[in-house]
């Protein structure tokens, strides 16, 4: 999500362009509209420092009703259609009442810190620098989003304000820890009479259905997978590094003040590396052949978007008439590579 790289405290405003206005400026790629995010700039005056921080708590709103372990045992034992094997299975671990939704969900605590400083150097070089840190835990256990951001903005003016410059640079580092969302489905359907872990040394200690109810027996191929093992036996993370920079020059020609020249150059670069490791003992991928158990998948992508826009605009009022003409050139190069 491109917006995940934007620090909300750096945003000054949102502008939405749609219909012909967006297409006229950005071409066919803007046929569905354009959202322009304007970030905060420096201001003339003495240095001012701002800090903001918050702690948030997230929790699930509702819980799916399912039988407890005791309710499920009673249901099977008193069911005239239950087989001997079914009755034996629910009595393997007497007294166990596992709430699988509680085992995979949590009350998540997240923190965010932002600090910025802005001012100007001798009234002609306004600046703003900012740093931000976000650590967001997900409601699903093991999931996490961590982000570092840093930005610099310079907006100097020269030649009696005839030349305005807008220089921006932003660096972003994001670390994602992904959780297997299949655990949510499994938590609503896995047997509540079974423990999270049992006395086995074959499936990482996690309860796993076997063909003969032996904790170290042969895994039953058609049975569901322990939802907690889906979370704790898989390490799926990615690291994203991004740089966004642009330089804009707006010049009101000295000898012809009705003529403005505007140049904007920018680059958006992102590189992401991911690593998904599944433990060989993971019940979901376990095989009797150790060489065919578990997995390790490395993935990456690299994206680079460069842009150059130049236009000249002449605007003049003649009595009751307004004359406005614009000519420009736009160049964009997009590169994407992945495995």
Enumerate the predicted regions with their spans:
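Non-catalytic regulatory/gating segments with a bias toward low-complexity or hydrophobic composition
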Residues: 14-15, 35-37
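Short beta-alpha junctions and helix-cap segments that line functional grooves
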Residues: 2, 21-25, 35-36
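Membrane-embedded beta-strand positions of outer-membrane beta-barrel proteins
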Residues: 49-53, 129, 167, 247, ...
């Amino acid at each position: 999500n491109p917006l995940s790289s934007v620090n909300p405290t750096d945003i000054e405003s949102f502008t939405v362009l749609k219909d012909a206005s967006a297409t006229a400026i950005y071409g066919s790629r803007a046929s569905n509209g354009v959202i322009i995010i304007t970030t905060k700039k420096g201001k003339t005056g003495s240095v001012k420092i701002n800090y903001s921080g918050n702690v948030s708590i997230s929790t699930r709103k509702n819980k799916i009703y399912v039988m407890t372990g005791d309710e499920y045992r009673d249901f099977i034992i008193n069911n005239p259609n239950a087989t001997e094997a079914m009755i034996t299975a629910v009595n393997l671990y007497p007294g166990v009442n596992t709430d699988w939704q509680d085992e995979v969900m949590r009350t998540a605590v997240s923190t965010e810190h932002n600090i910025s400083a802005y001012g100007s150097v001798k009234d002609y070089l306004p600046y703003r620098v900012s740093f931000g840190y976000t650590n967001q835990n997900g409601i699903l256990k093991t999931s996490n989003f961590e982000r570092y951001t840093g930005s610099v903005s310079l907006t100097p003016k020269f030649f009696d304000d005839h030349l305005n410059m807008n220089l921006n640079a932003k660096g972003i580092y994001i670390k994602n820890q992904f959780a297997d969302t299949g655990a949510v489905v499994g938590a609503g359907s896995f047997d509540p009479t079974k423990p999270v872990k049992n006395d086995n040394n074959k499936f990482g200690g996690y309860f796993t259905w076997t063909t003969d109810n032996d904790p170290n027996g042969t895994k039953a191929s058609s049975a569901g997978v322990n939802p907690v093992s889906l979370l704790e036996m898989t390490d799926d993370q990615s690291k994203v590094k991004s740089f966004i920079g642009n330089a804009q020059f707006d010049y009101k020609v000295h000898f012809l003040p009705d003529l403005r020249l505007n140049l904007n150059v920018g680059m958006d670069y992102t590189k992401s590396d991911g690593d998904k490791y599944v433990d060989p003992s993971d019940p979901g991928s376990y095989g009797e052949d150790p060489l065919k158990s578990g997995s390790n998948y490395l993935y990456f992508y690299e994206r680079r978007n460069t842009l150059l826009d130049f236009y000249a605009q002449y605007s003049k009022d003649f009595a009751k008439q307004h004359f406005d003409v614009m000519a420009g050139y736009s160049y964009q190069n997009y590169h994407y590579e992945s495995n």
